Amino acid sequence: MQTVIKNGTVYQNGRLIHADVLIEDQKIKAIGTDLTGDKVIDATGKLVSPGLVDVHVHYRDPGQTYKEDIETGSKAAAHGGFTTVGAMPNVTPVPDTPDLMKKMVQENKQKGIVHIFQYGPITKNETTDELPDYAALKKAGAFALSNDGHGVQTAQTMYLAMQEAKKNDLIVAAHAQDDSLFNHGIVNEGEKAKELNLPPVTELAETTQIARDLLLAEKTGVHYHICHVSTKTSVELVRMAKACGINVTCEAAPHHLLLTEDDIPKDNGYYKMNPPLRSKEDQAALLVGLLDGTIDLIATDHAPHAKQEKQGGMQNAAFGITGSETAFSTLYTKFVKEDKVFTLEQLLSWLSDQPAKVFGLKKAGVLEPGCPADVAIFDLEHETELKEKNYQSKGINTPFTGQKIYGATVMTMVDGEVVYQRGEK
């Protein structure tokens, strides 16, 4: 059967064009005008995008499925227009052996409704200095390496990890955090931490480890990717490293682009995340970094928690914010429609073809004949409200609930099959 998406504004090759998209046998067959098919999806007035790509999600499965599981996490991704995700390995048990990795990959495929690529850990159990067998993990299905949630504390361990990752052509995606400097902090170091009387987090906890790792990456030649950069100095370090030819890429998270420490209204656990919300100066530097290419892509760091884990004050709340279901619409509304900081084409690139390119996810994040029919359709014309009852994730831990947005997802297709349709829970 042939399905045609008619009369939409299609994002293709960095441009927006008025076109139809023809789908057959799970693939894009053609993009053009006056196309016909057995089934017609009317996209008049809608944006037709490649399925978005999020290289940073936490699905808590196995081990903490009361927070999220593969099924609900992938449904949340589809609700946000994402058709390809990278799942972090901070689950229980950590998939640090070939058998555990194979099992994770199989579970992702069986339970997920989007394409799920699985990270392997940089170190065994994510908290030791012992390296797993990277070659075996890659053979079992790992697409990259990360200890996300934990910084690699020992320089020698990271140096050895980068050497082995380079040998096996694996990206090292780092959560840059020196625990001795983080020192059980809660809120960015500054006036807000003083106002709330909460332990501060110095930016040095992030920047010193980035500086260390960039030198190690230069020495080893590994592809070093930095998760959720959040400070002005981090951006400056990456900018200098790229100018020196170091093989480094990095991502920014929607919440660090949209919010600052000044937006924390009170001691509210929904605003507790790691890295923490930073200063307005840091936020401005992230936006400049995106626009000048220092920051390569946007990734959500979707980190769901049970409601009770975010109640009360920030001191005892869990770190983390959901992002899969709110990323595109909140970013589009603020930075494209309202403030005109960047274009729709730029936003779509940072959320689709750029992450796919950086991580070598071939045929993801693009609409081209012969590629998988992974498609997202968004409504840019009508205002809607973000409501808890509409979330597909088990986690409702986001301060964006109640916000009026444009860019709600109308439909998401994976391999030509509808996996999300507005109005269906």
Curated annotation (Swiss-Prot):
| Signal peptide segment | none
Q: How is the cofactor bound?
A: Binds 2 Zn(2+) ions per subunit.
Instruction: Please give the pathway this protein is involved in.
Output: Pyrimidine metabolism; UMP biosynthesis via de novo pathway; (S)-dihydroorotate from bicarbonate: step 3/3
Membrane-spanning intervals of the chain? none
Q: Which residues bind Zn(2+) 1?
A: 56, 58, 148, 301
Q: What does the record give under GO molecular function? A: allantoinase activity; dihydroorotase activity; zinc ion binding
Instruction: Tell me which cofactor or cofactors this protein depends on.
Output: Zn(2+)
Chain sites annotated for binding substrate: 58-60, 90, 274, 305, 319-320
Q: Which SUPFAM superfamilies match?
A: Composite domain of metallo-dependent hydrolases (SSF51338), Metallo-dependent hydrolases (SSF51556)
Q: Which GO terms describe its cellular component?
A: cytoplasm
- Residues recorded as binding Zn(2+) 2, renumbered to this chain, are 148, 175, 228
- Give UniProt keywords alphabetically: Hydrolase, Metal-binding, Pyrimidine biosynthesis, Zinc
Q: Disulfide connectivity?
A: none
One example of a Gene Ontology biological process annotation: purine nucleobase catabolic process
Q: Which residues form the active site?
A: 301
EC category name: hydrolase
| Catalyzed reaction equations | (S)-dihydroorotate + H2O = N-carbamoyl-L-aspartate + H(+)
UniProt xrefs under PROSITE patterns: DIHYDROOROTASE_2 (PS00483)
Record-listed E.C. numbers:
3.5.2.3
- Sorted alphabetically, which HAMAP family does this protein's record hold? PyrC_classI_B (MF_00220_B)
| Physiological role | Catalyzes the reversible cyclization of carbamoyl aspartate to dihydroorotate.
The similarity comment for this entry is: Belongs to the metallo-dependent hydrolases superfamily. DHOase family. Class I DHOase subfamily.
**Name of protein:** Dihydroorotase
User: What is the organism field in this record?
Assistant: Lactobacillus delbrueckii subsp. bulgaricus (strain ATCC 11842 / DSM 20081 / BCRC 10696 / JCM 1002 / NBRC 13953 / NCIMB 11778 / NCTC 12712 / WDCM 00102 / Lb 14)
Please spell out the taxonomic lineage of the organism that makes this protein: Bacteria, Bacillati, Bacillota, Bacilli, Lactobacillales
